[in-house]
Amino acid sequence: MKSVLGFKKAKVTEKISMVTCYDYTLAKIINSTDIDCILVGDSGGMVLLGKKNTTYTTLDDMQFMTQAVANGATDKFIVADLPFMSYRQSLETTMQAVMALIQSGAHAIKLEGSSGNLDIIKHIVDSGVPVMGHIGMTPQFINSFGGFKVQGRTEEAAKHLLEEAKLLEQAGCFGIVLECIPANIAKDITQNLDIPTIGIGAGSNTDGQILVLQDMLGMNTDFQPKFVKKYIDGSKLFSDAINTYVKETKANTFPTKEHCYDYC
């Protein structure tokens, strides 16, 4: 999948697979896999840089990560997050941020929420840049939500999510991330849209799934949300490998002859 058209076709043909990525090395690995799309998420501020939450991720951070991923994943469709407040100050500031991410190698951008964003989305799309929406648990609104909490658990909240999704579609979004909402609500939203939905903690009836790469590879031991499936215990694998290297170094069993250069 290398374009927005691929997303639209996948709505009726196959499930869409996405992961986050923030660096060149992992991007190169992903580039050799069957993954459909990469999201350079503002979550990289937390996962890669150790920041408290995504409100601390800057445009400079996003440019750095997007460039790294684009250099490594040359065959993948790349979406990059507009960071906190970069699209809530002025239209000029918004478009400068959009341009920065596209020129860093992204093919599309993603922003959170619908309120106050619809005209912005239309302008970005009219300017030739595809936009992905994001509703439900939107991390940039963590201070309003009072933490990372499931959204849409009441009838009124569920109705609001569906309304948001329809408005984002009408504004021109080519797809929408549904994060941390009940599976039945995500299914209802998906069935009422012509554009694909990508779920994260939203059940199996969305048009696709996305996970933070480090979560699914078992690299984050201090953050294990319910919706994450750990496909390998990466933290243990890496720790064991590093400890083996330390033991061999101290025992002088590394390097061996095969790792040394001969004198000519």
Swiss-Prot record:
Its EC number is 2.1.2.11. GO terms for biological process: pantothenate biosynthetic process. Its main location: cytoplasm. It is found in: Cytoplasm. It comes from the Bacteria. Pathway: Cofactor biosynthesis; (R)-pantothenate biosynthesis; (R)-pantoate from 3-methyl-2-oxobutanoate: step 1/2. Coiled coil: none annotated. Belongs to the PanB family. This is 3-methyl-2-oxobutanoate hydroxymethyltransferase. The lineage of its organism: Bacteria, Pseudomonadati, Pseudomonadota, Gammaproteobacteria, Thiotrichales.
